[in-house]
Amino acid sequence: LIEEYIETVGEFGETRTTKETRAHFYEGIMYFCWAPFANYCAHHYAEYESAELDKDLPFLFLHGDNDSGKGMFLRFGARLISNGYVQEVTTGGDFVKDNIERAQASDTVFPYIVDDVAKSKIDRDIIKSYWEGKWDGSIQMPTFIFSSNDSTKPKSELRTRMKTLDFNVNFSELEEDEREAAAQIAGQADSCNLFPWFAHLF
């Protein structure tokens, strides 16, 4: 399923960097599988005096133009690690301070996934110091997965706290049957049972 989904980059998309973009899609899927274990890793890193959790536990930032498949990718990842229970993600308009603070107190390991968030909402101190001073191991805190259409990336001090993947592909010229085929491939995430297998190995 993973290979079939990543192949949509070359099969249905327009890109001059097919190999690199496929690699970024794959890295993104690996991040989704890792995301529920961020707190597990935090416990490990916190044992060291040199730990900087906000750098040791980077968020995932998907950067690309409109129609680069970021939204479908986020939904695919959410469905993949929830066996289809989570089908939609948060929109950028809901990414506000109150909701970020609720996430810090939510006691959940499922990532906070935000589609099409403005760069100005990411360039904030609450993101810069999300883990430090908030995480003490008593409750679980979700990591963040963002996508943005903004032409510029977050400022440099934020980029050290994020894994940035560029989706240099365009799916805007898809025919209806191609869109249906791509959606059908993504829909298989609901029942593939990949994440329980991955979690067991982890």
Model-derived regions, located:
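Conserved C-terminal RecA-like helicase domain
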Residues: R16, L53, F59, D67-S68, ...
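Feature primarily recognizes SF3-like P-loop helicase cores of small DNA viruses
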Residues: H24, V109, K153-F202
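Conserved beta-strand scaffold positions in the cores of enzyme catalytic domains, especially
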Residues: N83-E88, F144, M162-T164
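Conserved Walker
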Residues: H43-E52, W131-M141, D150-K155
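Short glycine-rich substrate-engagement loop in P-loop NTPases that contacts/grips substrate
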Residues: G77-T108, R124-D125
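Conserved nucleotide-sensing/catalytic segment adjacent to the nucleotide-binding pocket
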Residues: N99-S147
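P-loop NTPase catalytic core of nucleic-acid-dependent motor ATPases
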Residues: L1-S82
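Short, flexible loop/turn elements at secondary-structure junctions
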Residues: C33, L62-N66, D116-A118, F146-S151
